[in-house]
């Protein structure tokens, strides 16, 4: 097996173009960007006024099968496909989420793509970037401080301190902060109460920023966020505290999309970063809308498999944005299919055709899901260096035999050149296949019916069960008139079910909803299932242990 440069070595050897040159490539005027050094910029929201009459480009969504813990290269395929579209003469922008420091320091070590299909400068993007994550964290924690101060100063709204639902946030994995007590140390420090932290990317403010259309919509959404309940059970919002203006002020720059570039010097918008297993899992609507005004094709991704990010993209993001995806790319890998066929994680580099063939059932279910939405699709078989020709052909052959458009993808090793077959196939299905896009549920459906339709159609479950706590919350949501919102299921990414141990295509199972939480500002109801947590913990050997910086300031260990 030939040796390859690491992701960070490729990134650091790439000569970046000035970001002003990337902007000119998209016909962005100089006064419409705000530069952060030479290689990063924010795009002014004023650009929409100039481009409002321009037709939108087509949105291509990249999703995947249920992944292994290491991921299946979906971000890499997303970047590589956008580069490949340029190589076949199509004007494209890749629109991605910003990485969270939690997974970067924890398991993943970075999330800017890989190999010769990365967004750059990857060190900046994976760490502090343009400060968006910190602004969102600050806004989240400012709101928490405003709530406690309101209570300390007399509690005019009669907030029940046992029913404060707004948590503090931190953009790191820190299990010790899941459950905390604040207000200790005497009367001067406020009222003692139970509290806790969510990771920033699970904060409702992250979702609000990513679904807002503009600053006015952002402020409206911030005002409507439910932060607590009164002693008689009435919801208390951020607007009732009168702080939506201050929160919007903290976010006035964070709402602007970030312009960067790929390894091949093609444009990229990297903005917003909600997780898909505990939030809606898509980049900001503003970035997607901006990209659609600037290019003929927008290649974007939704977190984890089609059961999580893609389902939420369809039901939440497209509804908020009023657009229809042009096509979907479903990323599949030999190693993940072998895992779903029963190969232990430690043995995934070993050839196992029988396990691979069994695991294809997982891919089949995700294809069924995208087909249920009525969208054209292509299976991207993402090649890893250890894959054998027999294994790759087994997947491609199954796709051919069953009438599923598919292409081998080698963008990690070859950049855009390794994705031109995929790019041509995607263009082909958009031009030749009918787009029959429709939702799986209507907003007028009950919460129970929305969850049942997702569970049966997307997960393959027999139905949905509710804990006693969730049943009480159902009644509260209906009483408060929130049952007309879409639902956002918080679920494990490793299985179609709510049990991460049920690999492949599980049968004879139900989804159990243990808690329902309104995110009224974001515009959806979060349904928590299984043991999913909104503040992750670090693994035994965090990726941070391999990270360093040399005397010249050069980063090491990111990938």
UniProtKB/Swiss-Prot annotation:
Gene3D superfamilies xrefs: Domain 2, N(10)-formyltetrahydrofolate synthetase, Formyltetrahydrofolate synthetase, domain 3, P-loop containing nucleotide triphosphate hydrolases
Pathway(s): One-carbon metabolism; tetrahydrofolate interconversion
Assigned keywords, A-Z: ATP-binding, Ligase, Nucleotide-binding, One-carbon metabolism
Keyword check for ATP-binding: yes
Reactions performed catalytically: (6S)-5,6,7,8-tetrahydrofolate + formate + ATP = (6R)-10-formyltetrahydrofolate + ADP + phosphate
A Pfam match: FTHFS
EC identifiers of the protein: 6.3.4.3
Domain of life: Bacteria
Enzyme class, broadest EC rank: ligase
Positions bound to ATP: 68-75
GO biological process: tetrahydrofolate interconversion
GO molecular function (one): formate-tetrahydrofolate ligase activity
NCBIfam families for this protein: PRK13505.1
Sequence similarity: Belongs to the formate--tetrahydrofolate ligase family.
Protein name, UniProt field: Formate--tetrahydrofolate ligase
Gene that specifies this protein: fhs
